[in-house]
Design a protein with these regions (language model features):
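Residues within alpha-helical segments
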Residues: 59-62, 104, 192, 244, ...
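Pocket-edge positions in alpha/beta enzyme catalytic cores
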Residues: 50, 74, 235, 274-277
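Mobile gating loops/cap/lid regions near enzyme active sites that modulate substrate access
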Residues: 222-223
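Rossmann-fold NAD(P)H-dependent dehydrogenase/reductase core
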Residues: 2-217, 295-300
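C-terminal helical subdomain
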Residues: 2, 183, 207, 230-272, ...
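A generic structural signal for short coil/turn motifs at secondary-structure boundaries
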Residues: 109, 272-275
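Amphipathic terminal alpha-helices
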Residues: 280-300
Length: 300
């Protein structure tokens, strides 16, 4: 079977696959690797449901690619919008071959507190947990996949204790990239927790590092000082088609059928932050997150 590398693109990963009759959900489809994931899956015959902060943004993205796509509004900064998106997706009355948690923000200069948490934990982790747990029943029995776009920042930037549970709103101090790192660790730990929960249904869950992609919409939230480093970081970056490769690999390639609870980079298994393998850490993250959602998210 073909081996893919950091240079592989999403289209190369899907080159020999016919995805006709398959359904995929991609969050954050308006730009960057989310848009490329939407485009590549649709180009290979899949029906792709794409979410964005507004219906207009989702529709623009879907209209920009050939193939069968459906736009859905889902502002992950707002739990009410996420719950509305759940209802809209359920109304489609389809089963999904994969749900791809791609939407995210990175290192805004201010914490932007809402629901008692800063924006990165809210947008990147909590809203995905809300969306995925309420839609997990729509994943195909025996073959469905959950794919969470995490990051190497889960290892490189997350605090040594994993998540600052006593400082989720940043009131004890806010370092943008530290909070970004913990939100990406939360994505990884959530995927591992879901792998355990979904195993009995024959559904797999994995997380990934897409690579450093500087031409993505993710950098829109960066502060001025952080932007000064973009040209340097860009020297080590991937193209958007390369950045979407591992996502498409985990979502659709037969090589990873049945493999669950993993962390991948460059379409290969990678070493995760050790906290993600700690069952007690994952349980605490789940319990704290579930409590926040129970308090602030509307009922189904």
């Amino acid at each position: 079977m073909q081996t893919f590398t950091k240079h592989s693109t999403a289209d190369e990963v899907l080159a020999d696959l016919d995805l006709s009759g398959k359904n995929f959900l991609v969050t954050g489809c308006a730009a960057g690797i989310g848009l490329e994931t939407l485009r590549s899956l649709a180009a290979h015959g899949a029906h792709v449901v794409g979410t964005a902060r507004s219906l207009a943004r989702a529709k623009t993205a879907c209209d920009s690619v050939p193939g069968h796509t459906t736009p859905i509004a889902c502002d992950q900064d707002d739990f009410t919008s996420v719950v509305a998106a759940v209802r809209d997706i359920q109304a489609l009355q389809i089963k999904f071959d994969a749900i791809i948690g791609n939407a995210g923000i990175m290192a805004p200069p201010q914490p932007n507190v809402r629901y008692g948490v800063e924006s990165q934990f809210r947008v990147n982790h909590l809203s995905h947990m809300l969306l995925v747990t309420r839609l997990s029943g729509l994943l195909r029995e025996g073959s469905g996949r959950l794919v969470m776009v995490s990051s190497s920042a889960a290892q490189g930037f997350a605090p040594k204790q994993g998540v600052l549970f006593d400082n989720l709103d940043g009131h004890l101090g806010y370092k943008p990239f530290t909070f970004y790192g913990q939100s990406k660790l939360a994505n990884l730990a959530f995927a591992k927790s879901m792998a355990e929960q979904l195993q009995g249904r024959g559904i797999v869950a994995n997380a990934l590092h897409p690579g450093v992609i500087m031409s993505t919409d993710l950098t829109r939230s960066l502060g001025y000082v952080s932007r000064l480093f973009l040209p340097i970081v860009g020297l080590f970056s991937k193209s958007i088609p390369q950045g979407a490769a591992t996502t498409c690999y985990l979502a659709a390639h037969p090589a990873v059928a049945g493999k669950t609870g993993g962390f991948y980079a460059d379409c290969q298994p990678a070493k995760p932050n050790p906290h993600a393998d700690d069952a007690s850490f994952r349980q605490r993250l789940w319990d704290v997150s579930a409590a926040i959602l129970a308090q602030h998210a509307p009922a189904a």
